[in-house]
Structure formats: structure tokens, C-alpha cells
């Protein structure tokens, strides 16, 4: 994903998107956290962590590599083993360089027969370049993507494992988007489109070609870097613009789930991420759970570096995000 500098989007405040600093407007709209039942189903962070390791054991999942193909097979079989119906949406997608990435969006559906549905999604590919690494000699090294890729998929698999206990009132589609992290590195910026469309290729494709004709969902929740040791999640600007009510509900659910230390009820930055085409093209109000860390490393210290490895994953962050999702799902009627 590509971070959008707040200063470039000052006009967004006039559109109700807020600013990159803490404001009271959104937090004052948060609901009553004391009148909703708290689910007793518990997210297992150790299980989710094991799923991160399993993906990383294949190596960086860069499109058009054997590691990518092998991990795709693994994710498909894991969801199938949990009793979900799985669709592999194949597409040949063009990168900013004009290369063709053989891509697969993986859609795993719980109770596909139900009309009322929600989406939980993440990207599963790895960035080909560690272009934010402190060591410039490593900038052309692929990223392992334990946090920026594998963590979201791992949380989804663990949530899917618990659905028979949770007994949700709605169907759930877990979507693993491919080819998200191939935006131009700094040495190729001259080739990059100005609208950020070199990122999030898989979600752009799905948003224009959903896996089911006429597909709709109540809302979507995007998981992006949900295992960082330094993670803090603020209201993301694009989410507030298109899915404000869902955003506030989700952050309220986090307070009930005991994850208020992670989900700060204040406004953060903006991200060019998979939720943008989901909101703007598919028309599904979608929230982005993405870190907003004040300082030099907005998305966390391991973002797009060779240090994005399993040993730098926090089980507490996985637990907080996963438990928040279980709470949010349990509140659907």
C-alpha cells in the first residue's frame, strides 16, 4: 500500500474526512460500549502466529514465483479444511512496468447460501523490493511480509476456524487479494501513475469483477499489517469518508474486546489500499485496519524492509485485532 501524505489531502477535511491529528469529532460519535454483550469465543494468537510462519516458510510470495504458487495452494487448502467454500479468481494483471503478474484472488465463503454478508479481507502477496530498508544495499531484496501480508491472512484463518463456535447471523466472505504490493519503488517513480493505481491490482480487479454476479455485502473490513509490535490503529481517512458508521462501530467493538490500547479513538492518516476500490468501485463500505504510528515510520519500523519477519510479530497485536473481529461479527443481527 502507498501512504498518502496528509498535507496533500487538506481538502479532505472539507469533505468530512478529518485530519491526520487527533480530533474529537469522530470519537464523540462512538457508541455506548456498555450495553452490548461481549462474546465468550476467544481468539488464539498462537494459532494465528503459526499461520504466519507457515506462509513465510514458502519464502517471499512475490507473484510469478514458485513460493507464491505454493502459498496460494496452502491458503486454499487451509480454508477448505475449515469447511469453507473456496473460489480462486485468476487474472493476468499488468504492473507499472508493463509486466504481467499471474494473480489469484482467493475467496473463502462461510455459509455462501446466506444473502446478508460481510467481507473480511487482506492481501497475501509480498513486495518485491525492501525499498524502505535502512540498508540501501537491500532495497532490491524481496520482503518476507510476515506483517505486511501474512498477518492478515493468518487472522482470517483463525477467525474462520472459530465461526462454528461463534455462530454468526450473516455469511462471511474472506478475500485474500493478490498483487497488492507491486507499486513502483522510488527508483521507478517516473514510470508510476500519479493516481496510485500501480498498487492494489487484485482488489481493483475484484471490485470490477466480483466473484459472484451482482454481489453485495453489508460492509468490509480490510486487515493490513495486523501483527506489528509497534502497531496502533486510528480512524483511517478514506474509511471515515465512505464507511464512517462501520468504522466507529468497529472501534467500539475493539473497546469491548479489550483492545482499546491498540484501537485509538482518534483520526490518523490516509492510505492508498485495497479498501479504496472496494469503496469507490464495488460500492461496499469498507474500513481499513492499518497502523498509524507518529514519526518517521508511519506504518511501523518493519514496513517494506527485510525485517518484516515472524520474529518481529506481536501475538498481543494479533489477539487484539482477532478478538475485535470476533466481537464485531457477534454483534451482527
Give residue ranges: language-model regions.
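N-terminal capping segment at the start of a domain
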Residues: 25-71, 82, 297-312
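Bacterial signal peptide processing site
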Residues: 21-23
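Solvent-exposed loop/turn segments at secondary-structure junctions
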Residues: 61-63, 92-95, 112-114, 124-128, ...
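Acidic/histidine-rich catalytic neighborhood of metal-dependent amide-processing enzymes
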Residues: 140-245
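Active-site-adjacent substrate-binding region
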Residues: 90, 100, 219, 226-333
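C-terminal motif of bacterial Sec signal peptides marking the signal peptidase cleavage site
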Residues: 15-19
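Second-shell loop/turn segments in exported
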Residues: 34-42, 57-66, 93-96, 138-150, ...
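A non-catalytic alpha/beta surface segment that caps or lines the substrate-entry region
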Residues: 57-113
